[in-house]
């Protein structure tokens, strides 16, 4: 095992302990506090970006007197749980998410601007933007429930060449089996999955699209009265420089240099 991989594993263990003690401290010091359940599509214990995001959003809710617990679900499952009121918050959705989800209340203070990426085995497939799929004969797959990715791809991928799958593992497996040409998802999740599935020598290329996607926290509509206070708290934290401070601190836990 390489030294870098050992460092990554050590970093993830540290993140797991930090998340555990963060949750434990809330429950011990304030047992009567309200606790919200938040849905993520990637585990903060294994993702630099999600660990940073979870620290920020947890503090924001903490300032409002609310403890935050989280669960990891596929995007479509998370949307269903929010619709039925079985979770309180979703972590990362774009502004148009509420258009098709009337139970979703967008908190209009962006924490993160993200990008999509693609995995392929074909070195001749070179795409810089999602719009570059137009008029290409590529069999494209994406993870069901990741929006607005699905809507974007439906507009640009050749009819009959686009399909939705239920897990990112399935996306890589079908790619390796020659049943698809491109798998589109978040590049960080793809890269982490390649490592966890021990596919680093499989020849899978991961490239990031140039399109920027701005994402927001989402509340269930029963918490609509919290949308404005949460927006204000996040705005204050951003002005206080905590977004940058916490990112640097999280990078140190993950043992990554500043430019990664």
PLM regions with names:
Residues 54-63, 123-127, 131-139, 216-249, ...:
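Extended ligand-binding regions for polar small-molecule ligands
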Residues 31-47, 130-148:
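Short loop->beta-strand "edge-of-pocket" segments that line small-molecule binding or catalytic clefts
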Residues 67, 144-160, 235-260:
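Ligand-binding clefts/hinges and TM-proximal coupling segments of bilobed small-molecule sensing domains
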Residues 76-88, 155, 168-189, 196-197:
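Short helices/loops that flank or line small-molecule/ion binding pockets
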Residues 80, 92-102, 181-210:
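A ligand-binding cleft/hinge motif common to bilobed small-molecule-binding domains
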